[in-house]
From Swiss-Prot:
It catalyses: IMP + L-aspartate + GTP = N(6)-(1,2-dicarboxyethyl)-AMP + GDP + phosphate + 2 H(+). One of its GO terms (molecular function) is magnesium ion binding. Keywords: Cytoplasm, GTP-binding, Ligase, Magnesium, Metal-binding, Nucleotide-binding, Purine biosynthesis. Homodimer. This is Adenylosuccinate synthetase. SMART domains: Adenylsucc_synt. Pfam families: Adenylsucc_synt (PF00709). Its cofactor is Mg(2+). Binds 1 Mg(2+) ion per subunit. The gene is purA.
Length: 429
């Protein structure tokens, strides 16, 4: 029996929600280990659609759900989400949801700063969701953040808020924004403290006990490897490490506790917001893929940019993240296309390269080298076995496996969780 870490292998929006829910039903514990409420995922359970941003996917299935120390938590957004799922019949209690007591809090000032910076940047903006995730991580690294455990001691909270505002008010002055009052922020935090503190827990200890008891643990990542702050298309990235090895750090467990690492991978490529995208399509095929795949952000509603499958990027994600298999999603979106292209390399300054360079300028200048495969006419939608797939679809899948150097462990053929072909069980690896 193995624990499993699930991460995106592209720029996020790969369909992690469905795959995580499929695995969560079989897990005992589900853990979020990075990110904030900037990345949403959609689950369909018994015909009911849930849209989650902070809550682990196991929460809607009654599993022990954990928000790890690597997550930045907006308390107000959290309770909005808890109230939203409660209206759908899912009750979240401190017995079922544990939040790391050392998790950093996102405060209203973080969102304000995020949006002010984006507005000031003009055409050079990164394309953040404006929800304060980046500024909260900045405060964490600078050792001035407010953590969940700080809400339990008013004296400590006041000292830390005043210290925090010394920094933030200087930034706000520089942006021409009004300064913040410490008393107002402290009052807001003390008001929400009795609601969120019952969820606070030493989650590293909870996870250690679960591991010793032989419980199956599912580590749930947000965004995707190409949005990783170190390994992604910097600076057009998120503010945390999204690759699989961070599951251990962001949850408070040893690396050996993670087990099987599964990369969720679309059968094509999408991206939201600014940043390089070598295989982006600007023609009718790109628009067709976007319409068929319903490519709009769960949180932002922004249309996603669409393009051909980039095997160079995914192979890089496999190698950097130590992915042992992928879950291939949205294959059905490609049904009926006459031909399909796969990016197998890049051309840069006349040279052929097999990776995405780190330089922002070089990333924007690489040209994709394509291999063309014949498409298939029969539908793959809802297929539940390899026998249901067209031969040319199987050929496409096998070629992807060769190029990215990782096998397909799961194949998703519709948003419904039952429409999944299991090739290799991650929990039994």
């Amino acid at each position: 029996m193995s624990n499993v870490a699930v991460v995106g292998s592209q720029w996020g929006d790969e369909g992690k929600g469905k795959v995580v829910d499929w695995l969560a039903e079989r897990a005992d514990v589900v853990v979020r280990f990075q990110g904030g409420h900037n990345a949403g995922h959609t689950l369909v359970v018994d015909g009911v659609t849930y849209k989650l941003s902070l809550l682990p996917s196991g929460a809607v299935r009654g599993k022990l759900s954990i928000i790890g120390n690597g997550v930045v938590v907006d308390p107000w957004a959290l309770f909005e989400e808890i109230e939203r799922v409660a209206a759908q019949g899912v009750v979240i209690t401190p017995e079922g949801l544990r939040i790391a007591e050392n998790a950093v809090l996102i405060l209203p000032l973080h969102g304000n700063l995020d949006r002010a910076r984006e507005a000031a940047a003009g055409n050079a903006k990164i394309g953040t969701t404006g929800r304060g995730i980046g500024p909260a991580y900045e405060d964490k690294v600078a050792r001035r953040a407010i953590r969940l455990c700080d809400l339990a001691d008013e004296d400590v909270l006041r000292f830390k808020v005043e210290r925090l505002l010394t920094h933030h008010n200087a930034l706000l002055r520089g942006l021409g924004e009004p300064e913040l009052d410490a008393d107002s922020l402290i009052s807001a935090l003390l008001e929400i403290a009795p609601r969120i503190l019952p969820f606070a827990s030493p989650v590293w200890k909870v996870l250690d006990e679960a591991r010793r008891a032989g419980k199956k643990i599912l580590f749930e990542g947000a965004q995707g490897a190409m949005l990783d702050v170190d390994h992604g298309t910097y600076p057009y990235v998120t503010s945390s490490n999204t690759v699989a090895p961070n599951a251990a750090t962001g949850a408070g467990v040893g690396p050996s506790s993670v087990g099987f690492t599964l990369g969720i991978t679309k059968a094509y490529t999408t991206r939201v917001g600014a940043g390089p995208f070598p295989t982006e399509l600007f023609d009718d095929i790109g628009r067709t893929i976007g319409e068929r795949g319903r490519e709009f952000g769960t949180v932002t509603g922004r249309p996603r940019r669409c393009g051909w499958f980039d095997a160079v990027l995914v192979r890089q994600s496999v190698l950097v993240g130590g992915l042992r298999g992928i879950a291939l999603t949205k294959l059905d979106v490609l049904d009926g296309l006459d031909e399909l292209k796969i990016c197998t390399g890049y051309r840069l300054d006349g040279q052929v390269i097999d990776h995405l360079p780190a330089s922002m300028k070089a990333q924007s200048r690489v040209e994709p080298i394509y291999e063309t495969l014949e498409g298939w006419k029969d539908s793959t939608f809802g297929a539940r076995s390899w026998a249901d797939l067209p031969a040319k679809a199987i050929k496409y899948i096998r070629r992807l496996e060769e190029l990215i150097e990782a096998p397909v462990a799961l194949l998703s053929t519709s948003p419904e969780r039952e429409d999944t072909i299991l090739v290799r069980d991650p929990f039994l690896d």
